[in-house]
Structures are given as C-alpha cells and as structure tokens.
Amino acid sequence: MAALDSVEKMMSDIQYPIKGSCQCGNIRYQLLAPPLKIMACHCKACQKLSTSAFSITALVKADSLVVQGELAQWERLAESGNKNYAKFCPYCGNRIYHFNPDQPETIKLKAASLDDTRILNPEAHIWVCQKQDWYQIPEGVPQFDKQP
C-alpha cells in the first residue's frame, strides 16, 4: 500500500503542461492535461518501434496536445483490425503519437518523448500474448492477451 501511495503522491506533484519533443528537437509539444491511461504494449509492432520489449503509450485527449512543427504521417492496419496512423518527425523519424481516424477524440502519445517522464508508470500491459519471455510484468498490474 505504501508503494501505491508513493506513486499517487509523485503523480500529484506533476505540473501540467509537460513539454516534450522528438530526438532532434524539430518537433516540440505540450501535454496540457494528465493522460486518461498509461499502457505498456508488448505487440511485435511496438517492440520494433521501441527496439525494446514494449512501448509505453499514454492515451490522451486529442485537444490536450499542442504540437509545434510539421509532422509526417505513416499508416497501417493494426493486428487488432484498428486503423493505426503514426505522426512522426520527418527529420529524425521519432514517433510522437498514433491515432485512429475513427476515434479522433483520443490519441496515443509515445510518452517517453516527454521531458518529465514520471508519468511512465503503466496501469496495464496489453498484447502480452506477444511479450518477450524474459520480461516479468510487475505483480498486481492488469494484463491483457490482446487489446482490451
């Protein structure tokens, strides 16, 4: 219980807006409000994107993100069947967020691009059916085989 209290205290100390950027600094943005959810995605596409075992995604309201700079776009059909459009820096290639055009009210911010990364504490792990065997999800954190 003390660990949960510590996380809640840390999250309440975060001041919005939080600034973020791509690797080269061409794209800058501000997150104006707390995310709706923070998830760790273990799908193979996110493993390739992050070049790691999973990618951290913050589900945010679209109107809570203000972007400076011109983003490029890439599109694909996700394994879940959802449309997955990616916005990224055309210079360094760093992904900033994903979105589904059928759900324009929310976007999936690649939250490791934030300057203050204290919010990167996943509330759930998704696509664990594709998880790396060596990675152990912390006890008590909800997990889903695919997209909940």
Q: Where do the language-model regions lie?
A:
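A short Gly-Trp-Pro
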Residues: A2-P148
